[in-house]
């Protein structure tokens, strides 16, 4: 905006063509219905998990490594003071819960649920019962619930992150289950790596950083995929879990929280690795 560039809001991207050419094109529909055709030096697909740009890179919107999980998060927003000074991640016999804060008066909370559950199937009283049952030892501060939704769990990495003069970043390139809190962290890392590559390409005519982008980004992506899967499997109760599975899971959790090395690894991965570790 400060540079006076032509930024368009409310635009729907329809397709990307010419990834193999020197001038790829984006076809889109403007907020007023105007048909747009944009000739570009490079196209960055930062258009989310239903990416249009992904088709130009992988050949389809679904081309990638994929895993879906047998549980979801039931999320609520409520008007209440914080129940804790810190985040609460809870693994209980009743399933997982996350107690987080938005502000001094609005709180965000989640509990593990079936992916196909109807968000309107519970009364407010029942929702508080589900949440409280999953955080034994903590008394939740309740208040009016003004938003509820169900968040499905998926892991995805596109087969390719770049084709010609089109590259993917963020959720267009990968998605992770939210347990590890890695989605935004990964997206920012992608953008930093690709910005360096595009600067070298456009200002120095050096394609080597761009050629290296898929492999460089992938190393970090798969570390984050593992961490997100690990946190998810360690903290959630699988529908088919046996008594052995549950006891082993608790043993795994204790192995982490009772070990300085385990706590250090979790903290390092949760907050994000230095970008240089992916270079």
Where are the model-predicted features located?
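Conserved FAD-binding catalytic core of PHBH/FMO-like flavoproteins
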Residues: 2-5, 11-14, 21-37, 42-153
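Short, conserved active-site loop motifs that form the nucleotide-linked donor/cofactor pocket
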Residues: 5-6, 166
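Active-site flanking residues adjacent to catalytic metal/cofactor-binding acidic residues
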Residues: 46, 170-171, 189
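Acidic loop->beta-strand submotif enriched in PP2C/PPM serine/threonine phosphatases
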Residues: 152-158, 162
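Short FAD-binding loop at a beta-strand-to-alpha-helix junction that anchors the flavin cofactor
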Residues: 160-178
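A conserved FAD-binding loop/helix module that cradles the flavin
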Residues: 178-188
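C-terminal helical "tail/cap" subdomain of flavin- and related membrane-associated enzymes
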Residues: 181, 196-279
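Active-site-proximal alpha-helical segments within enzyme catalytic domains
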Residues: 191-194
């Amino acid at each position: 905006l400060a540079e006076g560039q032509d930024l368009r809001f409310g635009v729907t991207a329809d397709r990307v063509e010419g990834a193999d050419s020197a001038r790829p094109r984006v076809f889109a529909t403007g907020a007023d219905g105007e048909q747009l055709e944009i000739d570009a030096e490079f196209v960055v697909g930062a258009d989310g998990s239903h990416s249009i740009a992904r088709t130009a890179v992988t050949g389809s919107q679904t081309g990638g490594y994929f895993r879906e999980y047998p549980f979801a998060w039931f999320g609520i927003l409520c008007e209440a003071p914080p129940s804790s000074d810190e985040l609460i991640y809870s693994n209980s016999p009743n399933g997982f819960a996350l107690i987080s804060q938005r502000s001094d008066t609005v709180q965000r909370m989640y509990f593990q649920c079936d992916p196909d559950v109807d968000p309107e199937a519970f009364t407010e009283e029942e929702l508080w019962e589900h949440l409280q049952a999953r955080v034994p030892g903590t008394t939740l501060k309740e208040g009016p619930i003004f938003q509820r939704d169900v968040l499905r769990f998926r892991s995805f990495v596109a087969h390719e992150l770049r084709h010609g003069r089109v590259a993917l970043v963020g959720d267009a390139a990968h998605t992770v289950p939210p347990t590890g809190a890695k989605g935004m962290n990964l997206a920012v890392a992608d953008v930093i790596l690709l910005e360096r590559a595009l600067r070298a390409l456009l200002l120095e005519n050096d394609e080597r950083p761009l050629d290296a982008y898929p492999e460089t980004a992938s190393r970090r992506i798969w570390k984050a995929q593992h961490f997100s899967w690990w946190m998810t499997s360690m903290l959630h109760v699988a529908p088919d879990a046996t008594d052995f599975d549950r006891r082993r899971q608790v043993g795994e959790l204790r192995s982490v929280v009772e070990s300085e090395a385990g706590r250090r690894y979790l903290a390092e991965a949760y907050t994000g690795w230095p970008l240089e570790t992916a270079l």
